[in-house]
Amino acid sequence: MKKSLTLLILLLCSLLFSTVLSNLLVEPVQPNTVPAFPVETQAQSCRLDLSNELFGGVNEACGRNLDRSRCCPVLAAWLFAAHARSALQLPAPAPTPESSDPDEPMKPDDSQKCVNTLQSALLTKQIKIPQPNSSCDAILCFCGIRLHQISSLSCPAAFNVSSGFKNATPTAAVKNLEKECRNSSYSGCTRCLGALQKLKVRGGNKKTTTERGTKMMSKDCQLMGLTWLLARNKTAYIPTVSAVLRAIMYSPHPPHLNKCSPDQENMPLAVDSLQFQKSFSSSSHLFGVLPFLPLVLCIFLFLL
């Protein structure tokens, strides 16, 4: 009887071992390195830092279908993060044409170059965003994302710009965002949104001549404050930035009643890739041990 039981255990163990071995052999090997994406040179109009991004949250928000309130805030957060260092630079002042409008964002051709650069970077990470139609792209047309340079804005409540555009020093109101915008929950987003109110343009502004222009400049100053946060610490702030962008740019409420999405709606957020890598790494260690548990059990039974 004991001999028969031993033979049965050996047979079961051999079958389990062959199954585990075959699964391990067919499992694809994941590379440890992330392919680098070429960064735009100084001479090109659009300079995005996309060398090490894996665009956490974009697939969840945009991969299946295009929904403005779900997809656009995540896309905008990653585009602002990639453009952050360039946006905060103050180039040497150049003579501007008399016909130029200081309230305008980056020129359309330049914005399109940024869109093309971002889309190419997304494709290298196997992320394909659906296009609304043949004449409308997801980023510029559908989401309406526009990039600005700090030198094109007048945000005295947010940045002190020295004469000659040599330095842009963040005000206390902007530095306060570091404390108020660390939590991406509904309550944290609401706190951050309240702190951003202090960056709005008050009264007259030398770069705006209409009430509509002042409102647009106020929103752009708030977006530049969020851009400064992303330049300071993208990993810590990009989830909250995407939540706040949803309230500022894609909320169904009127502009003066911007509200963050309740936690119950479970809206997707932009998440730094490192967080995904850490969680995957910890779980992969666990799953790597699981296939060998049946073998350990067989050996234990055999020794009884």
From Swiss-Prot:
Keywords linked to the UniProt accession: Cell membrane, Glycoprotein, GPI-anchor, Lipoprotein, Membrane, Signal
Subcellular location(s) per record: Cell membrane
Q: Which residues form the signal peptide?
A: 1-22
Q: How does it sit in the membrane?
A: Lipid-anchor; GPI-anchor
Q: Which residue positions carry a glycan here?
A: N133, N160, N183, N233
Residue span(s) of the pro-peptide: 283-304
Work out whether the entry's keyword set contains Amino-acid biosynthesis: no
Q: What is its main location?
A: membrane
Q: Where is the lipid attached (GPI-anchor amidated serine)?
A: S282
The segments labelled Disordered in the record are 91-111
- Protein name, entry field: Uncharacterized GPI-anchored protein At4g28100
* Organism, scientific name: Arabidopsis thaliana (Mouse-ear cress)
Organism classification, top ranks?
Eukaryota, Viridiplantae, Streptophyta, Embryophyta, Tracheophyta
